[in-house]
Amino acid sequence: RQMCIRDRQKLMFLESIGDPSDLKKLDIKQLPALCDELRKELIQTVEQNGGHLASNLGVVELTVALHYVFDIRDKIIWDVGHQSYVHKLLTGRFKDFSTLRKKDGLSGFPDITESQYDAFGTGHASTAISAGLGLAKARDIKHDDFSVVCVVGDGALTGGLSYEGLNSIDGTNMLIVFNDNDMSIGKNVGSATKNLSRVRVRKGYLKFKSGLEKTVGKIPLIGKPIVKFLKSIKRAVKLSC
């Protein structure tokens, strides 16, 4: 892929990130500009190399938020492996991103041999919770100290391996980020899907969501930018798959 110097110079925030710790040096008000740069890089690279564009455009803000909040030693597992392009860009692979999906280049999925920040080699879907459970149990046995975060969609949550992980998770300190974007290859069916649909329209849930937005919005200086950023995350995850 050829990219002119002028285009590269526009990615001033992205170029400054060598690992996730550099992301924390940015002010929260600068994150939307970083997200714009990430989208430009995604579109330009996938246009040249092929790959999964929509699913990655849809999790730009979500990925930035996770790496901004969690520590560099924490483990983030993407249940849909081909949704990890933004994660790669924020974990020291920006300079090599033009090699994505090429021979001897970056993998289109998380690869534990490619980066210390790829905690597990996920493929398509439903493995993250069980994999995260294994990492969390090993951490506790070794008395280590890091968080385990699994990003799982509503479609992947219908997979049997997800249920296996949930069945064994009791008492384990780990976090599941539920990417409820109403997206899957086939139509979601079953009681889990029905119950999730009910939650989305419950008055209690809607009241809580509205109250949380108002409370956060009242925080001096940073309240409104945080609300705006969270809304952009919500819009983005609805487009992801």
How should these model regions be labeled?
Residues 52-172:
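Cofactor-binding active-site loop characterized by glycine-rich and histidine/acidic residues
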Residues 181-241:
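Long, well-ordered, tryptophan-enriched scaffold segments
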Residues 159-179, 192-200:
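A short alpha/beta connector and helix-capping loop motif
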Residues 6-91:
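N-terminal amphipathic, basic-rich helices that act as targeting or association modules
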Residues 1-5:
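Short, small-residue-biased leader/transition segments that mark boundaries at the very start
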Residues 13-19, 41-45, 106-118, 215-229, ...:
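Gly-rich Lys/Arg/Thr-decorated short loops/hinges at beta-loop-alpha junctions or inter-strand turns
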Residues 36, 40-47, 71-72, 102-105, ...:
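Generic secondary-structure signature for well-ordered alpha-helical cores
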Residues 31-35, 55-59, 124-128, 162, ...:
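Generic structural signal for well-ordered, non-membrane alpha-helical segments
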